[in-house]
Amino acid sequence: MELIVKDAQSALTVSETTFGRDFNEALVHQVVVAYAAGARQGTRAQKTRAEVTGSGKKPWRQKGTGRARAGSVKSPIWRSGGVTFAAKPQDHSQKVNKKMYRGALKSILSELVRQDRLIIVEKFSVEAPKTKLLAQKLKDMALEDVLIITGELDENLFLAARNLYKVDVRDVAGIDPVSLIAFDKVVMTADAVKQVEEMLA
């Protein structure tokens, strides 16, 4: 299949299996959920009655005081006692097979093509690391919410994009399922397209 290269007014031949496959919603959902789960910190922690500081002595005798019976100052019922079902640090990461991950990326890229959200350009750069230059370039292309993917990370482009809301710059190694679906448009250089095809082959 062929994709139009916007700034060169030519066509780029790409793999049907990478940019023209059916959208597998269930697979994409599973991979996106797994990716988001892997980003969770999982460091929350509370103390059980066994872990809080306090005496193990019975506060008062069982009978005869008129007060409710109590066996420990560390009881979850008491102020400064332990937590009944205390949260502990957890690893939330999920295993995703390479084949599934690659399949999800291909599905997303193919859907971007179908929805006209993927824009191919011959090259994409700015002369200096100035936000103003990139903002004007994007305005000329009628782009606001955009992910820019280049073959190699252009430092000028990266620095120029840092202060722009809803604009991100990645190289091919930095793409992931969540970032691909998070932006309205994805701009990809011809060099990046070839690298993506090799990576997902």
From Swiss-Prot:
The molecular function terms of the Gene Ontology recorded here are:
rRNA binding; structural constituent of ribosome
Q: Name one Pfam family in it.
A: Ribosomal_L4
Q: Which GO terms describe its biological process?
A: translation
Tell me which UniProt keywords the record has, alphabetically. Ribonucleoprotein, Ribosomal protein, RNA-binding, rRNA-binding
Is Nucleotide-binding included in the keywords of this UniProt record?
A: no
- At the top level, the lineage of the source is Bacteria
Q: Name one GO cellular component term.
A: ribosome
Q: Which InterPro entries match?
A: Ribosomal_uL4, Ribosomal_uL4-like, Ribosomal_uL4_dom_sf
Region annotated Disordered, chain positions: 45-67
Assembly with partners or alone = Part of the 50S ribosomal subunit.
In the record, the note on similarity to other proteins reads: Belongs to the universal ribosomal protein uL4 family.
What is the role of this chain? One of the primary rRNA binding proteins, this protein initially binds near the 5'-end of the 23S rRNA. It is important during the early stages of 50S assembly. It makes multiple contacts with different domains of the 23S rRNA in the assembled 50S subunit and ribosome. Forms part of the polypeptide exit tunnel.
Q: What is this protein called?
A: Large ribosomal subunit protein uL4
UniProt organism field: Yersinia enterocolitica serotype O:8 / biotype 1B (strain NCTC 13174 / 8081)
* Gene encoding the protein: rplD
